[in-house]
Structures are given as structure tokens and as C-alpha cells.
């Protein structure tokens, strides 16, 4: 294992982004999948990949226009020119708007990212996993069997902090443990739209356990509201 790029933190496998130098859990939540890489993950974290792509697009804008002018001399390119110019104008207009609305975009990204990550403590997360017997709440996979591929070898990785309701809270009340496979499969589907009898991993017992976990927080909130009103 390359200690400069990979290491174990708190018992779980982490990877260092070569761009921003941040140590992040080596999962597809933080890195894009790249099959040709030995660990199956991009060398840059997702945030840096998007940043580099934007910088490249802005840097090469003039070169794109020059190549377009050369192609305009070819037969049948007049109509293609109209479509391409329209596309570039839209992109340029979008870039101008982005430059004028940096603060608005920053706030939007913060709000978007806030709904991607859970704001829970390590203790809360461990209690959550303990409640589900350290198994994926959807398929029942044991955490010791939850592994990712690195240099041809499977090594243990932590479960994903799954948003049951993607538009719901970012705290422990909307969090359950999910393996990589179930997390990817569920994506943005509504909970019971995805987790039902048509799902090969469905279990009525696991469904009941998930609902019991979520309901305990609903009851706590209701009790708190009742005491406040009282």
C-alpha cells in the first residue's frame, strides 16, 4: 500500500486527493470510479475533478472557436455552425451569469452538499450501526464482509451513511447504514418505491427494523414539541 496516497484512519481505508491533499474515505461518495486505476478510484476527489473541468472549459474557450472557424470552410458546415454557435453562446452566457452570481452559486453548493452529507457524531454513527447489528440495513451484509477492491485485493470499508429520505434531515433521524451496492442501487429513489417486494434484497423483517429506527426519532420530536407547548 502506498502510504503517501492511502492509509487506514479509525479502522477504515482512506485515500489522499493529489490535488487538494485531503484524506477522504476511499468510496465512490468521495471519488469517481476509474477502473484502470489499481484502487478503482480517481486520483482527484470529486470536488477537485469538477473544479479542474470548469477551469479547462474556460481556458480552452478561444481554441474551440478557432477550430470551429476552420471547420466552417468544409461542405455542409453552415448548418452545423449555427447549432454550434448557439451552444457556445449558451455556455458563454452561463459563464457570465456564474461570474456575476458567485455568492448565489456558493450558497447553492453549500445547500446541495448539506443534503449529501450527514451531520452526525462518530458515537451516533456507531450506535446506528449497532442497532442494525453492524449489517447493511437493506440487504443484511455484515460490515466485516463490506470490502472495496484495492490493487487486486479486497479490503474492509465502512458502510455508507444512507439518507432514507433524500429531501429529509441530515442528522441521525434520517440515517441508516447501507453497503456500497445498496447505496448505489437506491440512488435518488423514494424509500418504499425502491425497497419493496420487487427488490431482490427485500426483507419484511429488515423493513420493520428500519421503520422502528426512524419512528423512535419521530416520537422523540413529538415529545419534545409537546413539552415545549406545555
From Swiss-Prot:
It comes from the Bacteria. Pfam families: HNH. Keywords: Endonuclease, Hydrolase, Nuclease. Residues 136-188 form the HNH domain. Its EC number is 3.1.-.-. The keyword Iron does not apply. It is an enzyme of class 3 (hydrolase). GO terms for molecular function: endonuclease activity; nucleic acid binding; zinc ion binding. The keyword Nuclease applies. Belongs to the HNH nuclease family. This is SPbeta prophage-derived putative HNH endonuclease YoqL. It comes from Bacillus subtilis (strain 168). The gene is yoqL.
